[in-house]
């Protein structure tokens, strides 16, 4: 015996998704990807910049020690007590850490994201009354009451604007102008 619905010529509904439903799902995934991918790429670049800042720790200590021992900022890496070759301080995304008249210069290599590859970021030492040496990252504000260390780029106690070549959107808040 046949089923009554089939006998009358009724159509059967197929199970599964229609083409329209699948296209809607693909469109939603595309929209989410368009939002998520740039945010993730920005996060990756910021992490690479952070590596560069972290690599400055040892050099900052050496510049401070040299300043307190000699009364002026070291002109070179060797004067700061570091190896003379800037590429000796390198990492996965950083090709060199240099000392240029007391100012630390991080250069990002070509393993880094294309947005920062080949660019630099600077840290400038300042002396403040009561707190010793503080560091100015890139184009951030000069520390309150801070005067540049004797012997740093710009000479004497003048404030110098040392702009990083890394776009500010990738810098930590402490490094932004």
Model-flagged regions — what are they?
Residues 23-36:
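Alpha-helical hydrophobic helix detector
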Residues 40-43:
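A short tyrosine-centered beta-strand micro-motif
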Residues 45-74:
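Membrane-proximal N-terminal amphipathic helix
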Residues 28, 45-48, 102:
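Amphipathic alpha-helical protein-protein interaction surfaces
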Residues 1-20:
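N-terminal leader/signal peptides at the extreme start of proteins
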């Amino acid at each position: 015996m046949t089923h009554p619905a089939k006998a009358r010529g009724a159509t059967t509904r197929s199970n599964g998704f229609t083409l329209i439903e699948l296209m809607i799902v693909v469109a939603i995934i595309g929209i989410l990807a368009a939002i998520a991918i740039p945010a993730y790429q920005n996060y990756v670049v910021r992490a690479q910049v952070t590596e560069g800042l972290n690599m400055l720790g040892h050099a900052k200590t050496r510049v401070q020690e040299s300043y307190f021992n000699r009364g002026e900022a070291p002109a070179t890496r060797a004067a700061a007590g570091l190896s003379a070759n800037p590429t000796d301080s390198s990492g996965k995304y950083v090709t060199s850490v240099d000392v240029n008249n007391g100012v630390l210069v991080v250069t990002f290599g070509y393993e880094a994201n294309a947005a920062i590859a080949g660019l630099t970021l600077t840290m400038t030492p300042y002396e403040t009354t009561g707190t010793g040496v503080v560091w100015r990252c890139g184009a951030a504000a000069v520390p309150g009451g801070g005067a540049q260390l004797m012997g740093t780029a710009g000479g004497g106690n003048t404030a110098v604007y040392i702009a990083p070549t890394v776009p500010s959107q990738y810098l930590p808040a402490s490094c932004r102008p």
